[in-house]
């Protein structure tokens, strides 16, 4: 696991302060909608990639990033509550990107956390 700021106590169990970076050439997605999900460990603790993919696909047609974020956070919280553990931070950012051509691209980004939401 990586995070943008180091955590000395967690370093002993493998947490690093070097971010994981992935570069993708969006030109190969011309005419398609791409979705990016960035979430805190409070989301990924119980919710896997396949589960997130199913939620993303549900909101894809309308490019409803806010609805997608809300459902991801809601489901994550439900998993935490069923686990009986204290609830970790739950934060999620979803971006739907529709690549049309090299001169134009549409971006819809919404962020929602367990405390409320922020739209960009």
Describe the residue ranges of each PLM region:
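PP2C/PPM-type serine/threonine phosphatase catalytic core
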Residues: 1-120
